[in-house]
């Protein structure tokens, strides 16, 4: 009798375990939305990994500009981006969430909204700050090349203080804080991390 109950319990646990594995295997995250004024453009969905960016999927947009991408559930935050040519929208993915993006091309890097994710709202704030810093640095390089190095150093220092205080130290365990640590600007065709891992 004891053996029968033990066998039944073991079989029950095995079935529950298999069901749990099967449900986990099918879990997905979704990135959906639309990009206006982008008919016939190729929209790339790219993963930002340790070895750089890799294309996960792509779609040629129709007149409506609707798109839908998905991927397997992630256990740790991962970073992706939506890209048409040089226009980029950064996306953070955590678990099985659905992120909804609405944008307008060709200014989609700055003219977009993101719903369904607190992390991505913060990533957007950081991306806009980065774009503004990049524009200011480019302007200084063009107008004051003799003083550009020292002025850009001050601008980057101010940026780091702002982002550290208002984003990284505020919620250090959030994905957007990790995203902030790897932001960069391009100076003279060379990318420079804003936060230098050897000094900051």
Where are the regions a protein language model picked out?
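C-terminal motif of bacterial Sec signal peptides marking the signal peptidase cleavage site
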Residues: 19-23
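A non-transmembrane, solvent-exposed segment enriched in polar/low-complexity residues
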Residues: 24-166
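Alpha-helical repeat scaffolds
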Residues: 194-200
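Amphipathic alpha-helical repeat scaffolds of TPR domains
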Residues: 172-188
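Alpha-helical linker/edge segments of TPR/alpha-solenoid repeat scaffolds
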Residues: 189-193
């Amino acid at each position: 009798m004891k053996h029968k109950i033990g066998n039944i319990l073991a079989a029950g646990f095995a079935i529950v375990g298999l069901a749990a594995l099967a449900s986990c295997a099918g879990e997905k995250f979704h990135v959906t939305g639309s990009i206006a004024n982008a008919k016939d453009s190729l929209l790339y969905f790219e993963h930002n990994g340790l070895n750089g960016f890799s294309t996960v999927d792509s779609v040629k947009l129709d007149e409506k500009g609707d798109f839908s991408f998905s991927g397997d559930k992630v256990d740790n935050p991962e970073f992706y981006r939506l890209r048409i040519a040089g226009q980029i929208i950064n996306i953070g993915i955590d678990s099985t969430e659905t992120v909804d993006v609405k944008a307008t091309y060709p200014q989609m890097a700055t003219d977009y909204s993101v719903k369904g994710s607190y992390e991505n709202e913060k990533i957007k704030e950081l991306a806009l700050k980065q774009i503004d810093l990049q524009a200011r640095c480019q302007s200084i390089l063009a107008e004051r090349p003799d003083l550009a190095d020292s002025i850009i150093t001050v601008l980057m220092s101010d940026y780091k203080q702002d982002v550290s205080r208002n984003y990284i130290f505020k919620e250090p365990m959030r994905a957007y804080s990790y995203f902030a640590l790897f932001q960069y600007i391009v100076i003279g065709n060379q990318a420079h991390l804003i936060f230098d891992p050897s000094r900051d």
